[in-house]
Amino acid sequence: MAGSSGVIVQVIGPVLDIRFENGILPDIYNAIKIPADSGTVTAEVMQHLGNDTVRCVAMSSTDGLVRGMKAEDTGDAITVPVGKEVLGRIFNVLGEPVDKAGPVEPTAYLPIHREAPSLEEQRPSTEILETGIKVVDLLAPYAKGGKIGLFGGAGVGKTVLIMELIRNIATEHGGYSIFTGVGERTREGNDLWHDMNDSGVIEKTAMVFGQMNEPPGARMRVGLTGLTMAEYFRDQMGQDVLLFIDNIFRFVQAGSEVSALLGRIPSAVGYQPTLATDVGALQERIASTNKGSITSVQAVYVPADDLTDPAPATTFAHLDATTVLSRDIVAMGIYPAVDPLESTSRILDPKVVGEEHYTIARKVQEILQRNKELQDIIAILGMDELPEEDKLTVFRARKIQRYLSQPFFVGEQFTGYKGKYVPIKETIRGFKEIIDGKMDNISEAAFYMKGTIEEVYEAAKEMEG
């Protein structure tokens, strides 16, 4: 019931205990407003303690809050703006614009806590989402409505890949994108905003940030804010939406920060005992339905490179595809620096992608794997000592590696190469010609930073001419 008022009885960091004397307790997940000198603080009800007290987690700093302060139950969960009006804007966890571009007058407001689509509404994701990026479409295709884990350290091109995906979905498919920065560095969010403005992608994108310096409550819920905006586009507008979450690990980390303060006994490695439930509640809402789909690309930080750590291990259970960015490939000057042997996809299956696509993808990986094995021999004995068959494999592998590079639209102003979108059919045809030996007499330099195979032929002619 809205209007029920209480009093703060305890403040421990971001966690507040509030007593409601009238015996009418707010529901779990209700938003509580606390007027303070520095502005209104919003908190979310997490637990009921006894008959008259609730334990809440604050969404902003609790500095200046003291016992005895009044608190009002809003009667509803945190609600955020949704609809076309959110595109091109930046929001915080509460759905308040933070880009100083004036207020937002949205189509509607929706609560951030919602049920996942029911089994009857869900549509299994066995359709490829064409990205126009050769290495992704061929070797680790994304499923419409699937979940993709993006593994990459600093400076390997994670942000550029994200921006290119947003641009391609917006331009080629007319879809919308939501970018959610969970525990992001403010600087990175700022850079992304400026880059998106410069490349014109921002018009079809909404951005939601819960930065690294914000309390754990904000970082724990900002993922749900972005997801709620994406769900509206899927359910009410029938869109295929792209949802970026960077970084999903920090969502788990925020939960573990408040878990002990809420009185829960920690589980393995100090994580919250509700880890699987928390991750599942977010991931299960990201799905394809009869109306549209949400495809999510989630950056995954792996603590100390330990894939058995409970946080990444729990996330892996939900992923359909993994795109691994490699520093070794960056060192070769090949962008996007996707590792073709480490990246995987559940839908790289002849029943989904077709026999031809599957066979060519596996053959490409086979050639690259054999080339990797031969590198030690080449380093010791040199190329001349290899049998003819292995020499051919190495030459083809070098061409494949270079042909996996591709100029991006969002990088045009930096690289000088015109961006290329390559349909899947063209990608398959190009790699088939390399595997079949039709390109054996063409210099490997002709394959670097090209879109379709026709461009390789043209470059080869120019080199000869």
Swiss-Prot record:
EC numbers: 7.1.2.2
Key word Thylakoid present: no
Residues binding ATP, per UniProt: G152, G153, A154, G155, V156, G157, K158, T159
GO cellular-component term (any): proton-transporting ATP synthase complex
Family matches, as SUPFAM superfamilies: C-terminal domain of alpha and beta subunits of F1 ATP synthase, N-terminal domain of alpha and beta subunits of F1 ATP synthase, P-loop containing nucleoside triphosphate hydrolases
Keywords linked to the UniProt accession: ATP synthesis, ATP-binding, Cell membrane, CF(1), Hydrogen ion transport, Ion transport, Membrane, Nucleotide-binding, Translocase, Transport
UniProt subcellular location: Cell membrane
Disulfide pairings: none
Single annotated GO MF: ATP hydrolysis activity
Gene3D superfamilies, A to Z: 2.40.10.170, Bovine Mitochondrial F1-atpase, Atp Synthase Beta Chain, Chain D, domain 3 (1.10.1140.10), P-loop containing nucleotide triphosphate hydrolases (3.40.50.300)
Domain of life per record: Bacteria
Catalytic activity: ATP + H2O + 4 H(+)(in) = ADP + phosphate + 5 H(+)(out)
Membrane-protein topology: Peripheral membrane protein
Enzyme class: translocase
Quaternary structure and partners: F-type ATPases have 2 components, CF(1) - the catalytic core - and CF(0) - the membrane proton channel. CF(1) has five subunits: alpha(3), beta(3), gamma(1), delta(1), epsilon(1). CF(0) has three main subunits: a(1), b(2) and c(9-12). The alpha and beta chains form an alternating ring which encloses part of the gamma chain. CF(1) is attached to CF(0) by a central stalk formed by the gamma and epsilon chains, while a peripheral stalk is formed by the delta and b chains.
Function: Produces ATP from ADP in the presence of a proton gradient across the membrane. The catalytic sites are hosted primarily by the beta subunits.
PANTHER family per the UniProt record, alphabetical: ATP SYNTHASE (PTHR15184), ATP SYNTHASE SUBUNIT BETA, MITOCHONDRIAL (PTHR15184:SF71)
Family as reported in the entry's similarity comment: Belongs to the ATPase alpha/beta chains family.
Protein name as catalogued: ATP synthase subunit beta
Naturally occurring in which organism (per UniProt): Ruminiclostridium cellulolyticum (strain ATCC 35319 / DSM 5812 / JCM 6584 / H10) (Clostridium cellulolyticum)
Taxonomic placement: Bacteria, Bacillati, Bacillota, Clostridia, Eubacteriales
Gene: atpD
